[in-house]
């Protein structure tokens, strides 16, 4: 079963932060959502223009930079950034990346549903919902007039959502970068099962028991707990203090507990995701660190990875772009240069053609026509052996 894909976005449903109601106090329906007693309004995660995608699906907050000059033209390749998933996740986790690239190319970072300034509350959180948020973001960029496929970078569990999105709409994505991706910790590669999750239902029931669910969430998101989990992520005492402060405020927003509890129960993980990674038709960059809790990538040594893969390992924790930003950027940019140098090789074109033929035919009539034309051209090129 393929992922459910988004409907076309209606331009009027996209609101600029300059004209929209205060995003710190509204829901997707426009109703005021009160802060808890003593609560602090959540400021923007990034110093950038905010946009909000209203339906279909949960309201999604975007942080957008379209610099003047070459990087801001509609022929430039946008970079889409997706944060990880944890008890206090948000686009604030992407700050070093956003700040580095915002001045030189179009960049958009999103708050996934249930996090940051996107819609929160008791929603049906699932991998399909998160995947759809990424696809809606790319579709929005297309609506702004950006003509090039995007470079996609996702962190930790969001790598799974990114892979699903890239497989669902292969021609929307120029490359896929997975930072500390989940699903590569075991040498036993189970079949990919997009219609299922790794949810433990008994655990989910325990977590959501009204007798203690609020107290449990408060314990998981206290300042001490958030600091503890960041230290485990960094594998070091030297965490980013600005991220800590933002996470503390983000975790206490109204409706904040629902998505993290779905995450803890396993409801956002997809079985066999490693097999999907290996099938991605786009060039893939995988990077990870060697410290902390996220260092098990045994599957990488047992997978027959495509020639279009590049794997870089940093002597850091799970978020290397915080600790070695210059080195991280240089490795990523080297990967992008390699993508440009090899994108016309027969193997790459053949993989894209096969993926396009297998992907659903969705989107606007223009997008459908472009995909069909590209598929036909790629079939001819592959047959001729170019």
Model-derived segments and their meaning:
Residues 2-52, 63, 353:
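An N-terminal hydrophobic leader/cap segment in hydrolases
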């Amino acid at each position: 079963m393929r992922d459910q894909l988004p409907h076309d976005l209606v331009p009027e449903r996209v609101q600029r932060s300059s004209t929209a109601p205060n995003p710190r106090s509204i829901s997707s329906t426009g109703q005021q959502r009160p802060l808890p007693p003593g609560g602090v309004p959540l400021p923007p995660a990034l110093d950038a223009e905010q946009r909000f995608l209203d339906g279909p699906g949960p309201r999604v907050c975007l942080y957008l930079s379209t610099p003047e000059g070459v990087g801001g033209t509609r022929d430039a390749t946008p970079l889409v950034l997706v944060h990880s998933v944890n008890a206090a996740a948000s686009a604030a986790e992407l700050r070093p990346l956003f700040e580095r690239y915002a001045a030189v190319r179009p960049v958009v970072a999103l708050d996934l549903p249930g996090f940051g300034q996107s819609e929160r509350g008791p929603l049906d959180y699932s991998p399909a919902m998160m995947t759809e948020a990424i696809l809606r973001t790319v579709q929005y960029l297309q609506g702004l007039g950006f003509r090039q496929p995007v470079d996609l970078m996702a962190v930790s569990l969001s790598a799974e959502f990114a892979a699903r999105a890239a497989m669902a709409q292969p021609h929307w994505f120029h490359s896929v970068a997975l930072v500390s991706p989940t699903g590569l910790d075991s040498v036993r590669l189970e079949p990919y099962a997009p219609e299922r999750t790794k949810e433990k239902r008994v655990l989910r029931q325990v977590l959501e028991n009204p007798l203690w669910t609020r107290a449990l969430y408060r314990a998981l998101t206290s300042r001490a707990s958030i600091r503890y989990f960041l230290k485990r992520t960094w594998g070091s005492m030297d965490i980013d203090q600005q991220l800590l402060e933002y996470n503390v405020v983000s975790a206490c927003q109204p409706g904040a507990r629902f998505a993290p509890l779905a995450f803890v129960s396993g409801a956002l993980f997809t079985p066999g995701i490693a097999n999907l990674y290996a099938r991605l038709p786009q060039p893939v960059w995988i990077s990870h660190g060697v410290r902390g809790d996220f260092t098990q990538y045994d599957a990488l040594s047992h997978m027959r990875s495509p020639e279009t893969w590049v794997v870089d390992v940093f002597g850091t924790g799970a978020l290397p772009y915080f600790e070695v930003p210059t080195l991280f950027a240089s490795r990523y940019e080297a990967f992008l240069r390699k993508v440009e140098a090899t994108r016309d090789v027969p193997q790459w074109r053949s993989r894209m053609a096969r993926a396009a033929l297998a992907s659903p035919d969705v989107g606007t009539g223009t997008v459908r026509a472009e995909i069909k034309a590209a598929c036909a051209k790629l079939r001819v090129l592959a047959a001729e052996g170019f």
